[in-house]
């Protein structure tokens, strides 16, 4: 039986306690005593792998661990694929920090099935009372900029382009991360469509179409 209430919000398991490691070398100090701890360590290992793949900050990883532990305590993780729960935890944590990660990028991992991720996302958000507010293309600019150059700009010309086209019906039902990536490509053209597509986990053809849409709408503004 899983003891959800015994979970601590730390990083490494030593002497039966999950502790945050200051030097992040938690693997060498772990002593796994039961199935509950095994599940937690598996989750953290998956989180580290996804974090490395996405070059995520330590602060964001810590925030995702907190979300995962909250989900674990609620019992919503029971019977669900651990990798999907971890990906959802990263998504929620990134939204809370103001730098949301595109869902399409999280589900690129071989460990994360998109259909199961979507179901898990709804379940975890319901269990943790997370607001399911829709995001706009501008919300994804910080993540895209960080992935492409490691920097963000308060005076982002891509944001100005997105503000100019507003909520045009041309983009209704379109992935906002794809629209954001297309705007970055258009205003800079320092990166290829393939590069910006990879950042948001979408196809080059999708970005090419969003670029075409943006050009068409911008010409009418």
Q: What kind of feature is each model-predicted range?
A:
Residues 1-221:
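Non-catalytic, interaction-prone regions of core transcription and DNA-replication machinery
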């Amino acid at each position: 039986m899983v003891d959800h209430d015994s979970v601590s919000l730390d990083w490494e398991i030593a002497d039966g306690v999950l502790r945050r490691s200051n030097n992040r070398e938690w693997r060498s100090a772990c002593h796994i005593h039961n199935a509950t701890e095994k599940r937690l360590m598996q989750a953290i290992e998956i989180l580290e792998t996804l974090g490395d793949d996405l070059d995520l900050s330590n602060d964001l990883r810590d925030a995702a661990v907190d979300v995962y532990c909250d989900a674990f305590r609620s019992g919503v993780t029971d019977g669900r694929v651990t990798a999907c729960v971890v990906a959802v935890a990263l998504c929620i944590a990134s939204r809370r920090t103001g730098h949301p990660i595109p869902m399409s990028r999280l589900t690129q991992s071989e460990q994360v099935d998109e259909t199961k991720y979507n179901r898990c996302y709804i379940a975890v958000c319901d269990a943790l009372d997370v607001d399911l507010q829709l995001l706009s293309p501008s919300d994804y600019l910080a993540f895209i900029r960080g992935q492409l150059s490691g920097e963000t700009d308060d005076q982002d010309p891509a944001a100005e382009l997105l503000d100019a086209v507003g909520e045009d019906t041309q983009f209704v039902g379109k992935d906002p991360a794809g629209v954001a990536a297309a705007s970055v490509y258009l205003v800079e053209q320092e990166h290829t469509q393939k590069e910006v597509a990879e950042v948001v986990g979408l196809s080059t053809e999708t970005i090419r179409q969003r670029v075409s849409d943006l050009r068409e709408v911008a010409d009418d503004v």
